[in-house]
Amino acid sequence: MLFRSQDRANAEQQAMINRLADEFSNELNNLGVRVARLEDRVGNVKVTGDARLRYKDAEHAKSKFDARARVQFNAKVNDRTDAVVRLTSGNFELGDSRTEGKADAQIDRAYVNHKFGERVSLKAGRFNQVIGGGLAFDGTFDGAQLNVGNDKIMAQAAYGYMVSGDAAGLTKEENVTDLIVNVNGKVGKHAMVGGFYDRINQDDDVRNVYGFNADANFDKIWIGGEWLKASSLEESQAWTAGVGYGNYDIKKQGTWGVKGQYFNAKENAPIIDTTYNHIYTTDAKGWMATVDYALQNNVGLTANYGFDWKDQNGNDKADFYRADLNYKF
């Protein structure tokens, strides 16, 4: 009898639920649509940023202490499209109250990225572009970028204008367009190799630049390097090689890493906006040591020391020093 009573009660409850659902179906549907729309919009915009305090000095030179702050907005347009905008203060010297020493907020990233499935994406606007391993260029680029690939091999084509480094401050008429092709592939479990070609649409001798790069990581050991050249232009080779040890991750307190690199760039090397922190980018050769340490989660200290630098004729160049205190949020 008890089981029959429970069955009857359950049946009556279900019947009541069905009647209420039928009676208020429109209201429930409207509420459901509104809730779904709200859920779709929750978390659509992600805000991140970073701040940096930097100290620079060199032998027989005046030291400089400057700062920079950046805020980035990543907006989810739909499940395949993202829009990104980043504001930056630029580098401003602390203690300099003149107009040129003040922070000047501007947009240095503004682009849309659309995914065509899992292996193809297209980016357009103002974004960061890297050529090869970054020895020649790792900076701001206005144009379009196509990416195709998977976990083992990646091909990238970009067309547009370099607008940072030596290309900063140029008008559109003064600037030139670049067609960049990068190809990178994984070799085994630990190594990546890549090559690039950069076609520069201008009339002088620097029109075709190519290069190769490689990186290998074995647990905490890193070995890597890059070589590049402008074809049909003498004294245009540049290369770097280095070795490092550690597991530095700015997100994890207490992690650290050390690195030593050698750089050699001829007088006409096509270095526009390098990814590295050495101050002599052409007609120079020398060493740079780097130490990274995560003081706290998302707080990192980086120190660089450049030593034994000379020009290509063997004349000494000044040692240089740099320390960055970086904050991520």
What residues fall within each predicted segment?
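Short, Lys/Arg-enriched charge-dense amphipathic segments
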Residues: 32-39, 110, 147-152, 282, ...
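Outer-membrane beta-barrel pore domains
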Residues: 8-15, 19, 35, 54-64, ...
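Outer membrane beta-barrel
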Residues: 44-46, 50-56, 62-168, 173-194, ...
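N-terminal periplasmic/intermembrane-space "pro-region" immediately following the signal or transit peptide
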Residues: 1-52
